[in-house]
Curated annotation (Swiss-Prot):
Gene name of the encoded protein: SUB6
Induction: Expression is highly up-regulated during infection.
Propeptide: 21-127
GO molecular function terms listed in the Swiss-Prot or TrEMBL record: serine-type endopeptidase activity
Glycosylation sites (chain numbering): N252, N264, N408
Protein name as catalogued: Subtilisin-like protease 6
Length: 412
C-alpha cells in the first residue's frame, strides 16, 4: 500500500449547460459511482442561501417522485452536506440526469462534479537522540547527510499538538502510540478500527514512540476508507469537514486550536475542484495540511489534493537521496521526504515496510507537529518554514521540481 488513488470514468459528457453551473467531466482513467455527484456552491453563498437551496432541492425531488411514482427506481437525493468555514459549501447525493440539469441551472451553484471511488495502491542544544532507528527515514530527517542510523530531535517532540490522520483509521491500541492515539470519526463503514493497515502505518510515522517523528503528539483517526482501502470522494470530503470542525472545537475559538493542529492526507487522484476547494478551506482555517504527491510518476498538477497550492505537497525520496521511481513531481511539489521502504506500524501490534508518497507525507506532517511543539508558527505558512529548513539533496528530482529534502534543524 502507499498512495491513495481516485478514479473517475466520464459519465457527464452528454450533459451541458448554457448560462448555468459548470458540469465537470471526469478524467480518462477513472471509476465513477453511478448517479452520484458533488454539488459545490459559489463562494459568496451564505448559510441562509445554502439552506434555502437545499430546501428547494428536497421539494423538487419530492415533487418528481410523486409524479413518477412506480415508474422507475427513485433516486436517493441529497445524502450529505458540507460546510468548511465560510469558503466551501456543498452537498452530495444520488441524482438522475434531469435533476442534475435542474441543479446546474440554480444561480447559487458553482459546479457539479461526479463522485468517484478512492482506493489504496502499493507501490540543537537540548537534543536527545534515538540510536539504531527502526526506519531510515527518521535518521534522514534528523541529519544533514544520508546514511545515518541516529535520529536527533528536541525532547518536546510535538507535545501539545494534535495530528488528524484522514485515512483508513488507526489501531489506537498499538503499544507504540503509548495511549496518545484516539478514535475520531468514521465515514467509511460501521467498523471503528483500521482493518486495512494504511492509516496505522501513516500514523506511526507521524507520531509513534519508536517509529514517529513527533513522539509526543496526540493522534486522531478520521476513517474515510474501508477495509479494502476503498471509499468515495464525497466521504473523504466529509472526513475533512469533520476534522476541521473538531480541530477548532466545533467551530469555536478556531485560531488558537487550529494553530496547534496538523493534518495528513496520504490520498489523492485525478484533479478535483471539489477536493481542492475543501483542502483550501482547511488551510484558510489556519491548519497545516500535508498531502501525498501521488505515485503515477507524472506531474502532480494533475492530482488532487496535491495540486492545491495552499497545502504542503510531498514527493517521495529514496535512501540514497534520489527521487523514488513512482513519485509524482513538478511545480506543485513543495518538498521531498523519505518514501521508499519505510518501516512503521501495523495493526495488531506489529510493523510493516511500505513504499509510496503515502509514506513520505506523514514525515512532513510529523515534522510540522514537531516544529509547532518547538514554538514555530502553525498553519499553511509552516510549509514555507519547512522548505526554508530543507536541504538541497535530491538528485534528479524531476522536471520543474524542487530538490529540497526535509530536515528538522537538529544541527547534526
Amino acid at each position: 500500500m502507499g498512495f491513495i488513488t481516485k478514479a473517475i470514468p466520464i459519465v457527464l459528457a452528454a450533459l451541458s449547460t448554457v448560462n448555468g453551473a459548470r458540469i465537470l467531466e471526469a478524467g480518462p482513467h477513472a471509476e465513477t459511482i453511478p448517479n452520484k455527484y458533488i454539488v459545490v456552491m459559489k463562494k459568496d453563498v451564505s448559510e441562509e442561501a445554502f439552506s434555502a437551496h437545499t430546501t428547494w432541492l428536497s421539494q423538487t425531488l419530492n415533487s418528481r417522485l410523486m409524479r413518477r411514482a412506480g415508474s422507475s427506481k427513485p433516486m436517493a437525493g441529497m445524502q450529505d452536506k458540507y460546510s468548511l468555514g465560510n469558503v466551501f459549501r456543498a452537498y452530495s447525493g444520488e441524482f438522475d440526469e434531469a435533476m442534475i440539469k435542474d441543479i446546474s441551472g440554480h444561480d447559487d451553484v458553482d459546479f457539479i462534479e461526479p463522485d468517484f471511488v478512492v482506493r489504496t495502491t502499493t507501490n540543537g542544544t537540548n537534543l536527545t537522540h534515538q540510536d539504531n532507528v527502526p526506519s531510515w527515514g527518521l535518521a534522514r530527517v534528523g541529519s544533514k547527510q544520508a546514511g545515518g542510523t541516529t535520529y536527533y530531535y528536541d525532547p518536546s517532540a510535538g507535545k501539545g499538538v494534535r495530528a488528524y490522520i484522514i485515512d483508513t483509521g488507526i489501531d489506537t491500541d498499538h503499544k507504540d502510540f503509548g495511549g496518545r492515539a484516539k478514535w475520531g470519526k468514521n465515514f467509511a463503514d460501521d467498523m471503528d478500527q483500521d482493518c486495512n493497515g494504511h492509516g496505522t502505518h501513516v500514523a506511526g510515522t507521524v507520531g509513534g514512540t519508536q517509529y514517529g517523528l513527533a513522539k509526543s503528539v496526540s493522534l486522531i483517526a478520521v476513517k474515510v476508507l474501508d477495509c479494502e482501502g476503498s471509499g468515495s470522494n464525497s466521504g473523504v470530503i466529509k472526513g475533512m469537514e469533520w476534522a476541521m470542525r473538531d480541530a477548532s472545537g466545533g467551530g469555536n475559538g478556531t485560531a488558537k486550536a487550529a494553530g496547534k493542529t496538523v493534518m495528513n492526507m496520504s490520498l489523492g487522484g485525478p484533479r478535483s475542484e471539489a477536493t481542492n476547494q475543501a483542502a483550501k478551506a482547511i488551510s484558510d482555517a489556519g491548519i497545516f495540511l500535508a498531502v501525498a504527491a501521488g505515485n503515477e510518476n507524472m506531474d502532480a498538477q494533475h492530482s488532487s489534493p496535491a495540486s492545491e497550492p495552499s497545502v504542503c505537497t510531498v514527493a517521495a525520496s529514496t535512501k540514497d537521496d534520489g527521487k523514488a521511481s513512482f513519485s509524482n513531481y513538478g511545480s506543485a511539489v513543495d518538498v521531498y521526504a523519505p518514501g521508499k521502504d519505510i518501516t512503521s506500524l501495523k495493526p495488531g501490534g506489529s510493523t510493516d515496510t511500505l513504499s509510496g508518497t503515502s509514506m513520505a507525507s506523514p514525515h512532513v506532517c510529523g515534522l510540522g507537529a514537531y516544529l509547532i511543539g518547538l514554538g514555530k508558527q502553525g498553519g499553511p505558512g509552516l510549509c514555507d518554514t519547512i522548505k526554508e529548513m530543507a536541504n538541497d539533496a535530491i538528485q534528479s528530482p524531476g522536471e520543474d521540481t524542487t530538490s529540497k529534502l526535509i530536515y528538522n534543524g537538529s544541527g547534526k
